[in-house]
Structures are given as structure tokens and as C-alpha cells.
């Protein structure tokens, strides 16, 4: 990554809660050029687990690419507020994912987490849903 900064748009989707789930991740450079898209089927899980799994996939890919700074965009208010410390992680099945995310976040010089509206995250949402559709239609 030339500038050392990666922009990550993440989304998790589940049909039913729990239900068939997938993640969508888009990594771009500072000019908005897409460096990587990830669409991955997760199996049966909850929407919130899918959101965290999308975050972990983005952070792992950013580390692989040698990014020093990561800016995460998510439409999940729960995920963003938990990462910022304004919501406590009460769910036992989210706690290990939260801890892993914090551990990965600590490897970067800086991580910024921003809440965005669904309309600004439509592309990541499409990837997450495509992963589910491709699995269910095979």
C-alpha cells in the first residue's frame, strides 16, 4: 500500500438470525481504487457474528498488505460502538471475535472506525449477499 493507508468497507449479512450468512469486504486506496473484494459464505450464524467476521477478514487482509493505518467503514452500529467502547460486549459468542479484532487492531499504527449509512455500504452488502446466494443456489 503506497500511502500506508487502507480504507475498508465491511458488511455481514444473515438470512434469519441465525441463518445462512456471508461477509462482504472492499479494500480501497486513498483514491478509491479497489485493491481487493472479499465475498465469503460463513454457514449458519447470526448477523452480528457475520459483521465481526467481516471486520476480521478486512484487518487480516490489511495486515497482509502491510498497511500502517486502516479506516473501517461499517453500517453496524453495534460493531462500531463496541469497538469504540461506548457499548459493552454482552454477548458471549461475540466476545472472542471482539478480542481478536482488538488484538489485530493493535498491530496497526492507527485504526479509525466509522459508522456509515447502509446506502454508503451497498457494495459490501451486495458482496455479502452474493456469497450467500451463490452457496444457496448450488
What are the roles of these predicted feature ranges?
Residues 1-49, 59-68:
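RNase H-like nuclease fold core
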Residues 10-17, 56-129, 134-136:
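RNase H catalytic domain
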Amino acid at each position: 500500500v503506497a500511502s500506508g493507508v487502507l480504507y475498508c468497507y465491511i458488511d455481514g449479512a444473515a438470512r434469519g438470525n441465525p441463518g445462512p450468512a456471508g461477509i462482504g469486504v472492499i479494500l480501497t486506496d486513498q483514491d478509491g481504487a479497489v485493491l481487493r473484494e472479499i465475498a465469503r459464505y460463513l454457514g449458519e450464524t447470526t448477523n452480528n457474528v457475520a459483521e465481526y467476521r467481516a471486520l476480521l477478514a478486512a484487518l487480516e487482509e490489511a495486515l497482509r498488505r502491510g498497511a500502517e493505518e486502516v479506516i473501517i467503514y461499517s453500517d453496524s452500529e453495534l460493531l462500531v460502538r463496541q469497538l469504540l467502547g461506548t457499548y459493552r460486549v454482552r454477548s458471549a459468542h461475540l466476545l472472542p471475535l471482539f478480542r481478536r479484532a482488538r488484538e489485530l487492531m493493535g498491530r496497526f499504527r492507527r485504526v479509525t472506525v466509522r459508522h456509515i449509512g447502509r446506502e454508503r455500504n451497498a457494495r459490501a452488502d451486495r458482496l455479502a449477499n452474493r456469497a450467500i446466494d451463490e452457496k444457496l443456489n448450488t
